[in-house]
Amino acid sequence: MRRRSSLVLLACAVFFTALSPLMRWYAFPRLAKIPPGQYQDMVLEARPATLLNYGTMKAERVPKVTIVQTLKGDVAASDRIERSAGRDIVVWDALSYVAGPDGKMVSAIPERYLFDAHSQEPVHATGEMVDGDPVRREGIEFKWPFLTERRDYTYFDAQTRTSAPIHYKGTRTFRGLEVYYFEQTIPWTRVALPKKMPVKGITPQSVAKMGTTRWYTTKRMFWVEPVTGAPVNGQEIHKEELRGGDLLPGGGKVTAFAGHVKMRADYVDSTVALVTSQRTLVLLLTRYLPWGFLLLGAVLLALSLYLEARGRRPAPTAARPPAPEAAAGGGAAGGGAAGGGAAGGGAAGGGP
């Protein structure tokens, strides 16, 4: 019975030990992915900011500028592209909506971003665009890969429509989470005017005819939770200018927008809470279950060997009872005792 139990435990030990690396290196890469129908929004603010007044064509100091970013998954488009690509694809329709202190639109730039649901690598297909212009992304945007590494990545900049390195600058603690801090600086670059302008009658084409161009620079900062690859905080030191042409008095330059853009505090709180819960699920597949299965396999193996050793130990032999003494020998011994008594009597009698 012990030998049979030992074999069962040994089989279980082998199973759980083999399951440990399979969970980490086979199951995790296939199970961890971005859902295609995900929706999320984020509000960022620059307080205070500099904003161009298109009525006077002069830059003005304003109390705040609000930027609302939304990401919405297009499930139908994902399914259609998956059938031809043969892998899990996510299609995000993003919108960056900038509003002045009065709530009126300053700009609205849509994007369509396609990427691999598991690795976050960009996928190139029809419909990939920024503000209606076809683009071909290289590197990441919005999110880092699961199990982010301490290294530089290539990050896509939607304003310039180009990719550039975003540099790993160290490990920090943010709201109780260990995060990786990344920075990217885009130098002054000529960029396209938004298709939607804040003043009726002014279009990118009419501005271009006047010879006026738009220039942009930014310092981009992200605090990324490395297990999920999700940014828990983001900031930009952002500046835009209009330069030259007949639109500006004297053909000089004017600040169109400048400010230190930060995530609003309530959105930071909700993002940290969401990422913390998702982090637990990823750790379950990459750390808790693999190490738990490995430890369980070791315990079962030790128990199996213990039962096997006990099963092979020889059973103790029963003690044999002593052989009974012969009856004749007992009578002679009794006679000797009687004779001793007589000798004692003789000694007593010899006293007087």
Where are these regions (language model features)?
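Membrane-proximal low-complexity regions enriched in glycine and acidic/polar residues
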Residues: 141-241, 245
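A generic alpha-helix propensity feature with a strong bias for hydrophobic helices
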Residues: 66, 197, 201, 207, ...
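Short conserved micro-motifs at the rims of enzyme active sites and ligand-binding pockets
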Residues: 193-194, 246, 347-352
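Extracellular or lumenal secretory-pathway regions
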Residues: 2-150, 261-289, 293-296, 300, ...
